Amino acid sequence: MQTLTTPQFQSVPQTHNAFVAIDNVSKIYPTANGDFTVLDGVNLTVNEGEFVCVIGHSGCGKSTLLNMVSGFTQPTSGQVRLKGKPITSPGPDRMVVFQNYSLLPWKTAFDNVYLAVNSVYPTKSKAEKLDIVRQHLAMVGLEDAAHKKPGQLSGGMKQRVSIARALSIYPDVLILDEPFGALDAITREELQDELVKIWEEHKLTVMMIT
């Protein structure tokens, strides 16, 4: 696992063949008092199968950086690439797990995951899609809670559903935006251990901020 704190961004060499490449990226927001620079000349490379954790204080630009990898926002200058191609919009090759779970409250845990699988793989048979959902709920230890709705689940269980949903469409990069921030210390530690185990077993490429 590779850990970077924000002051180290600029010291990371530019690499054109990286799985994820962030090349000389800057982000500037206009304000009433003039331009506000959030990121300035950031260089970062992530190789396939790496778990990279970006650590920094609140407001330092961590979420902005991951939003550019996710495709939710574009850099003011520089470029973000995945497998050599510029990232210009969100896509199923990059799945985000947010702090606030982002589950549909009227659907069960199973259906929340199934919705993602069905959207990304509409041509797969229903049996295949159901099997994918079962596999990924089992991966996070929720096979016995598949029938429950988010309101019936603990915070840790909701985040497990979010992780299962993200992994179920087999993204190239799993993006974690402070996914454990709303959890108690014990649950946070358990989920961190589970996530590292899943990463090791399935050779995922993960970017996480905290």
Regions found by a protein language model. Name each.
Residues 110-118, 130:
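Short helical segment in ABC ATPase nucleotide-binding domains corresponding to the A-loop/adjacent helical element
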Residues 125-145, 197:
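Conserved ABC ATPase "signature" region
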Residues 70:
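Helix-to-loop junction immediately C-terminal to a conserved catalytic motif
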Residues 188-202:
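Helical segment within the ABC ATPase nucleotide-binding domain
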Residues 55-57:
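The feature captures the beta-strand-to-loop junction immediately N-terminal to the Walker
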Residues 78-90:
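Conserved ABC transporter NBD signature motif
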Residues 174-177:
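Catalytic Walker B motif of ABC-type/P-loop ATPase nucleotide-binding domains
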Residues 148-151, 169:
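Conserved signature/switch motifs of ABC ATPase nucleotide-binding domains
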